[in-house]
Amino acid sequence: MHRYRSHTCGELRSSDVGTDVRLSGWLHNRRDLGGILFIDLRDHYGITQLVARPGTEAYEALDKLTKESTVRVDGKVVSRGADNINPDLPTGEVEVEVGEVELLGAAQPLPFTINTEDGVNEERRLEYRFLDLRRERMHRNIMLRTSVISSIRSKMVALGFNEMATPILTATSPEGARDFVVPSRLHAGRFYALPQAPQQFKQLLMISGFDRYFQIAPCFRDEDARADRSPGEFYQLDVEMSFVEQEDVFRPIEQLMTELFEEFGNGRHVTSPFPRIPFREAMLKYGSDKPDLRAQLELVDITDVFEGSEFKAFAGKHVRALPVPDVSGQPRRFFDQLGDYAVSQGAKGLAWVRVGEDGKLSGPIAKFLTEENVAELTKRLSLAPGHAVFFGAGEFDEVSKIMGAVRVEAAKRAGHFEENVFRFCWIVDFPMYEKDEETGKIDFSHNPFSMPQGGMDALENQDPLDILAWQYDIVCNGVELSSGAIRNHEPEIMLKAFEIAGYDAETVEREFAGMLRAFRFGAPPHGGIAPGVDRIVMLLADEPNIRETIAFPLNGNAQDLMMGAPTELDESRLRELHLTVRKPQPK
């Protein structure tokens, strides 16, 4: 028999009754019922119930062990009997009557319980992450991540992509987030950087003559944490394709996402094909370029309805309406609570009216609406008895943010929100440029390296604020999974694009010398995308925080509490790396 086990703890069934077995695992739980000791033994594969009878050596040994100690047991599989079957366990029809016990590793008193999801704070969980990962939910999340990545690889190969590795030590990048830098021992005063993304290398692979590239790429950014973003390190499905237009990129990625979310979504419906929504339309209808399409409500721009209005709350402002059917009969509390939510999102209040059975409008602002206002709103919003309308007024961006959040919250409260579904969409036609509100200067809106729609002709003849870019995002349930673009592979177009944003040719040639040099040796048209693996798993696991799907994440302050990183270096290491440390002076 094997030194540690003949079977796993998730393997035994009623067909194994009478078999002598050896199991190893963690002491998950212990119960003493009428002098008989019942132990739940857990390993990676499941749980098997052990039974030890009083007066036996096995009973004495198991009775002394602390929870989460590792043990090896020898025993015989017996039937639990019809009255004692546990239908929640695959092994629930049997138990193992223990004859021999060997302690493999004793556990100290636990900082928190493993077999229940108690309210232990995240910092403690991350400090003892090796214990936290023993919990069923966390263990399941990490195994889901493993399966998702394995499936991505096989699906990408089936779609004709080739997996290739790109460097981890590279040059610093002048754009994007802050780099993590690595000092060079051999080249004093010089530094490598960990890649924020393999962006330049994957484009160089296309210029090198490869056609369809992918990798599960580690990326490093020195940025602050959010619920959907882990500080430090994250992983993305990095993709690049040659001789493609936008829809050529969409097709394989849409197929991949549909199949992936159907495979691991536990029956949640995946809407396909994914709608293509222009950026401007998304901002107007949903108040966000990351719309949650499970909310079956849309915003309507009614700014023109109140042009010249004497109603000061709306006059001269951008006004957005949110019509909500079947809520007119809701109590005043419904409207007040939605107003409180709007205030929590930054609004000063939330104006509203409702349509009665007689078709007349009532509510806090009904008296300020003229007959012309009411007629136009009724027509524009298709109002009918039972409807309510919520209004937001102010600057475009402010109203979009607030009313976009109100749209989703109202849908949830009013029963117009789809559950158990993955609603994807593509956001397309991003503006190439925007005007800096403080300086009034033209700057890039999103990705400066994307191809402008219309190419050089657009750059030379259109108002910069009217130029659209071949940029796109893929969004699922309000979570941005990735940005992508058709790349600007023509040096003259790139130089012109940067010139419009205020960069002279000398600066661009210096900062992006490597890419521009490669572009001048016959670069193919190419484009790509990089969906975030962590965010994909977060959605599939239905977790609110990305750190719940990563085995060993940093905390929100970019610290590894388990390993003690970041650490200080001793003076000899600093000298070897030609470094001195200057800590900020306390204020």
Swiss-Prot record:
Residues reported in the UniProt entry to bind L-aspartate: E175, R221, H446, R487
Keywords: Aminoacyl-tRNA synthetase, ATP-binding, Cytoplasm, Ligase, Nucleotide-binding, Protein biosynthesis
Positions that bind ATP: R221, D222, E223, E480, G532, V533, D534, R535
GO cellular component: cytoplasm
PROSITE patterns attached to this UniProt entry: AA_TRNA_LIGASE_II
Species of provenance: Streptomyces coelicolor (strain ATCC BAA-471 / A3(2) / M145)
Primary localization: cytoplasm
Protein name (Swiss-Prot/TrEMBL): Aspartate--tRNA ligase
Region forming the signal peptide: none
Enzyme class of the recorded protein, top EC level: ligase
Quaternary structure and interacting proteins, as annotated: Homodimer.
